[in-house]
A protein has these predicted regions:
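Active-site C-terminal subdomain of aminotransferase-like
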Residues: 208-211, 218, 223-329, 342, ...
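Conserved PLP-binding catalytic core of the aspartate aminotransferase-like
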Residues: 305-314, 319-354, 364, 368-372, ...
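PLP-dependent enzyme catalytic core of the Aspartate aminotransferase-like
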Residues: 66, 70-74, 78, 101, ...
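Active-site phosphate-binding strand-loop segment of PLP-dependent enzymes
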Residues: 58, 158, 162-214
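Conserved PLP-anchoring active-site segment centered on the Schiff-base-forming lysine
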Residues: 125-144
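Conserved N-terminal alpha-helix of the aminotransferase class I/II PLP-enzyme fold
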Residues: 69-117
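Short, structured coil segments at secondary-structure junctions
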Residues: 108, 132, 152-154, 208, ...
Length: 415
């Protein structure tokens, strides 16, 4: 079928349906470097304004750090803009292996392999190490990139209820006839901000002869005593078989991801993982900046400690104001609003108050689970947090949601 008027109208009707359902996503144009204070043009064509950013993955405030920028610039001058090649042809510079070795040391694993993104890492790892005689058993709230990666793999699939260890044990028992069992989980769940029970998961893996996979993208650099991740926080360093993470959040915020873990698994990814074999290498400028990031966070926990203090202050302030929050300790603090239109309307009003915090709704989260996901950074100063709490309180009072839970919000606004 050609792209005729009928097809065009069909697509337009689909888009109209998304708008009518209140599920249409808009982009905001940022006209400054990533930071706690940013300049945003919203809506498109409007005059830009300075706002406080509460929705970036810039957990350690390193995205625009002068030393990271300087290292990236030096890498650009020394190693060039790009390599115009995949890794195994002529796309591996010595700095790529340097970064992989630094990540291995920091994460406490045996080896590491860089990918263009963590989504690519998750898309490639399962197919590379599992076959149709194996089983993947995943938490039901794993990241979308994991879901997509599992779809590309020939191994059988099953799920367990979110963070329900009894259900996981049942599934592991059920699948004892499979050749290999792989438990799959996020370290920190990106929408809710809660941490996986990795200590129990590792115990179950040993009991039922399974391997463990963790995507630690929302933890690497700041969760755990020295910021190594959820596996450090849970006391299971050395017990995770496959760990994926990103350079696009706390570790500089640019792009790039990796598979880290058992040496044989990493080598199989080097030989078989299609996103690794058929994608351009991570650019030298990003590699150079990421090496400097690891130097900064390996030498001091100051930023990680500040992030933790900021998170406690922010969470306590929102709770005291009467917002319905998801429980947790991570810098992802979701303000639960349940109704998609309510989340979008409050987000727009917060923007008018100088606060940039985006509403999340289906299909990013399940229907009836809309929220404003706030994210805290070590780059936030006290005045940023206080201004944010004041604006949230003002907008919350306007919509009458303070002190309300899901049942009351549903009665007032519907789902």
């Amino acid at each position: 079928m050609s792209y005729n008027d009928l097809v065009r109208d069909q697509y337009r009707q689909e888009l109209d349906g998304i708008r009518e359902a209140g599920l249409f996503k808009e982009e905001r144009f940022i006209k400054s470097p990533q930071a706690a204070d940013i300049e945003v043009e919203y809506p498109a064509g409007a005059d830009s304004r300075k706002v406080i950013n509460f929705c970036a993955n810039n957990y350690l405030g390193l995205s625009s750090h002068p030393e990271v920028v300087a290292a990236a610039r030096a890498g650009l001058d020394d190693r060039g803009y790009g390599l115009s090649s995949v890794r195994f042809i002529c796309g591996t510079q010595d700095i790529h292996r340097t970064l992989e070795n630094r990540l291995t040391e920091f994460l406490g694993t045996e080896d590491t392999l860089l990918f263009p993104s963590c989504m690519d890492a998750n898309a490639g790892v399962f197919e590379a190490v599992l076959g149709d005689q194996d089983i993947m058993i995943a938490d039901r709230l794993v990241h979308a990139s994991i879901v997509d990666g599992m779809r590309l793999c020939k191994a059988q699939q099953d799920t367990y209820k979110h963070s329900n260890m009894e259900h996981l044990a049942e599934k592991l028992q059920l699948h004892q006839d499979k050749r290999r069992r792989l438990i799959i989980t996020d370290g920190v769940f990106s929408m809710d901000g809660d941490l996986a029970k990795l200590d129990t998961i590792c115990d179950l893996a040993e009991k039922y002869d399974a391997m463990v996979f963790v995507d630690d993208s929302h933890a690497s650099g700041f969760i755990g005593r020295t910021g190594r991740g959820t596996h450090e926080h849970c006391g299971v360093l050395g017990r995770i078989d496959i760990l994926t993470t990103t350079l696009g959040k706390a570790l500089g915020g640019a792009s790039g991801g990796c598979v880290s873990g058992r040496a044989e698994i990493v080598e199989l990814c080097r030989q078989r993982a299609r996103p690794y074999l058929f994608s351009n290498t991570v650019a030298p400028v990003i590699v150079s900046g990421a090496i400097r990031v690891l130097e900064l966070i390996s030498g001091s926990t100051e930023r990680r400690d500040k992030l933790e203090a900021n998170t406690v202050f922010w969470r306590q302030g929102l709770a005291a104001a009467g917002f319905d929050l998801k429980a947790g300790d991570s810098p992802i603090v979701p303000v639960m609003l349940y109704n998609a239109k309510l989340a979008q309307d409050m987000s727009r009003d917060l923007y008018d108050e100088g606060i940039y915090a985006v509403g999340f709704f289906f299909p990013v989260v399940a229907k009836g689970q809309a929220r404003i996901r706030t994210q805290i950074s070590a780059g936030h100063e006290q005045h940023h947090l206080e201004a944010g709490l004041e604006a949230f309180g003002k907008v919350g009072r306007k919509y009458g949601v303070l002190g309300l839970g899901k049942k009351e919000i549903k009665e007032k606004f519907g789902l």
